[in-house]
Amino acid sequence: MNLCDIREIKQIMNMFHLNFRKELGQNFLTDRCVVEDIADGCCDDRRSTILEIGPGIGTLSWALAERYDKVVALEIDKGLIPVLSFTMGEYRNFSVVNEDVMKADLGALLAEDFARGSVSVCANLPYYITTPILMKLLESGLPFDNITIMIQSEVADRLCARAGKSEYGAITAVLAYYGQAEALFTVPADRFVPAPKVNSTVVRIRLYKERPYHPKDEALMFRTIKAAFEQRRKTLSNALSAGFSELSKEQLTDIIVACGHRADIRGEKLSIADFVALSDAIGEAIQSKK
């Protein structure tokens, strides 16, 4: 069975009386080399457990199952569960759970796997759900080694941007707090069925085992990042004054300058280390007023 062959994909879909569901962002890869490259880049440790989000008909699942000790897949579409039983039946190290990843208790689902060894994530994510799923994985506190995702190239550019670049935004800074993102390769739109309107990029995020950043108040740091980018056309002092009513614009400007920045700097110029220092200073200023 070749799950990258468009004819076999259509035969399988017809066999199970299924249609491609655009609302779920279902696009199936038809390039076997790309599939194998994604699987190879997912994790360095072949003894790992892989959490696959959105396996579809198993296009990537088989390659993961052939490379890693165990694959646990989460599939939201109930209609694809019997399809996966058919396409992945020969792989005893593969299992699928019919559940929405946004509602799933990943800690409970993968408890034995985390206790046994390393766990990484692999997913082909549609645009509309990329950020929510990524944030759930990052904020879960679970010790994933890597998160490898295939996403729209435009989104990948934002995830991998460096401070000072136009693509750099709140999600970039937040991601940099948890790990390091690297774009592995681009996948042209014509490698999918149905073909999306844009190219995709495979991004691997290596999560820190011990984070190098230590804000005094993590929630305040995230609040600072959010405020800095909600009005990105404005200077950082103006953006922060809209997000921190506890302090005056003058106080915030003084804090920005005290942290070593120009008074007219914009948020996109600050690295995650800068945001940690800035949020710590803001926190101290707020506390001093109480």
Indicate residue ranges for each PLM-predicted region.
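Active-site-proximal catalytic alpha-helix in oxidoreductases
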Residues: 230
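Short amphipathic alpha-helix in the helical subdomain of ABC transporter nucleotide-binding domains
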Residues: 249-252
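Mobile late-domain/C-terminal helix-loop "cap" segments
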Residues: 259, 263
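Catalytic cores of RNA-modifying enzymes
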Residues: 1-227, 254-257, 268, 277, ...
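Short helix-coil junctions and helix-kink-helix linkers
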Residues: 241-246
